[in-house]
Amino acid sequence: MKHTLNSQSSDMAGLYTLSLRMVIGWTYFSAFWRRLILENKLIPDEKGYIGEKFNHFLPNALGIKPVIEYLVTHPDVLQRSMMIFTIIEAIVGLFIILGLFTRLMSIGIFSLALGILLGSGWLGTTCLDEWQIGVLGVAGGFVMFLTGSGPYSLDHYFKKNNKKFTQKKWFQWLGSGNFPVSDPKGFVLAGSLIILGLTLFTNQYFHGGVWGTLHNKSVKPKLEISKISHQHSKLTFEVYRTEGADVYGSFLIGIHILDKNGKILKELDHKELAGIPKEDIQNHHVAKVKPGKHSLVIPLGAKADVTLNIDDIFQKNDIHSLKLIDVSGIEWIEKID
């Protein structure tokens, strides 16, 4: 009798989370649907390539930055990883919708959401959308692990038809049914507090959302200039965009080479920057710095060595610093070591 009551309770818990299961399942399955069925976004160097979106996560990712950096500097590995990642999202999302091996798939939801949170939780131009997707996915995955799926699921269908594997202990952990912990209160409380702690920590780390001053690294572009050197008729520097909106680039409309008094020794305007030869730009990542129609375009996460011709600067020893000017009016100046 007790087993029957427990079974009914677990079925009802799974029933109550049906809408959550369907919606979360679709959010992950739809990633596969968008990238491969509606459009093919897994082809490098084509518009909408998912690898470039992944590159946008790099500058301010938490804890997984070395992994992202390795992938975006190895395009072949990145493409394979994006394919595998998309297939995993499809399987996890579809199985969650169908209620098949629900608890195992909920671990997949938890893991995918955690990856989104750590990688892209800092993005969001008008609201904290990537962070919200991440923390809600983590919490939703945990809830579905606790409840399993109810009557409208393949797990329930297999149990109802007395399939042998549903009687195994592992099915309770990986499928659905009675939660295989005799007193789950401590487990639920501990898990919930850990997820709350993760939520508060990442909210503060990425956005200052718990105390102090709010900050949003997606509002305006930020460029880091380094490794400036000049030899004979060439000046080379490394530029790396670490902040700003991920949906469009920083548009450089001016570069000034200055002396120690701030006097302009050489100036490149937007037309000259739009005409920089591609061989003078050596990109490090899949998100590429490249000449645009009216400027030099620098996407979020892009890093490149840019070479300028300074043959027309006669007193090269006077070169002191480099200034980059964005179309928004923001300027960045870096001294030459």
Provide a role label for each language-model segment.
Residues 1-60, 68-69, 76-85, 101-337:
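Extended, low-polarity transmembrane helix blocks
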Residues 92-101:
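Transmembrane alpha-helix interface/packing and boundary motifs in multi-pass membrane proteins
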Residues 88-90:
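Core segments of transmembrane alpha-helices
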